Curated annotation (Swiss-Prot):
This is Tol-Pal system protein TolA. Residues 112-206 have a biased composition (Basic and acidic residues). The keyword rRNA processing does not apply. One of its GO terms (cellular component) is plasma membrane. The lineage of its organism: Bacteria, Pseudomonadati, Pseudomonadota, Gammaproteobacteria, Pseudomonadales. It comes from Pseudomonas aeruginosa (strain ATCC 15692 / DSM 22644 / CIP 104116 / JCM 14847 / LMG 12228 / 1C / PRS 101 / PAO1). NCBIfam families: tolA_full, tonB_Cterm.
Amino acid sequence: MKQQFERSPSESYFWPVVLAVVLHVLIFAMLFVSWAFAPELPPSKPIVQATLYQLKSKSQATTQTNQKIAGEAKKTASKQYEVEQLEQKKLEQQKLEQQKLEQQQVAAAKAAEQKKADEARKAEAQKAAEAKKADEAKKAAEAKAAEQKKQADIAKKRAEDEAKKKAAEDAKKKAAEDAKKKAAEEAKKKAAAEAAKKKAAVEAAKKKAAAAAAAARKAAEDKKARALAELLSDTTERQQALADEVGSEVTGSLDDLIVNLVSQQWRRPPSARNGMSVEVLIEMLPDGTITNASVSRSSGDKPFDSSAVAAVRNVGRIPEMQQLPRATFDSLYRQRRIIFKPEDLSL
């Protein structure tokens, strides 16, 4: 019986080998699970636990087998340690890379956030600048509009003032023109009235002279001899004496005519004063044409003397003298003296 339970050398190595293999499998499984699910920890020295199973075999082969298994286990544990170190370094590298990536992501996020903030700040600043620019443009437009309105108001007021001034000047000018026109019309009327009056006086004098001439012709025929004897006299006194003999009516009428005609042609000079007098000698032909006029006694004022001579010469011709008998004309009017006075004219 005792020999029946005694094992062969191969049987005595079988179970230790199986146990060693199982042990290695368990160790590798535990290492794999530990590596797969273990949290990231700082590297630490691996702890290898070895279990030594005392086999009941007392044979040298069993001892050698156990030693071989132990050596294999130790070798296996050493390789496992290297694997774990490599994996640990790999994990640490991955962790560093992950941290670096996270830091980069954080930095990128911060940069993006900063960029976004900068863009927002820039947009806000641009918006504020545009608002300020728009406000300034609005104020400038309002100021420009106000200035334009001010200038327009000034121009309008200036135009109104100029219009008022022009209206006042036009009114003043019109009033002056009206006054001047009225004065001219009044002067014209006065001159016309005076001219009409003088013309009427001349016509009356002509009629009177014509009547007197007719009477003189009749009287001259009666006193022809005596009148001819007196023709040689050239003094004023003798002229007046002869006129008295021939008839004061004849000489008076012609003298009035001469006075009226000369008065119409006389233009009073500025230097003429009342009380002044000048005597002018008039020379005529039988047809009444005035051939000469000269000063026979001066007033002492040359302009006044010249105005008297010019008035006589401007008469030109007195046709009424043709009505006188030749003898009467020669004795009284071939040379006739006239006295000019500023206030009147007398012969």
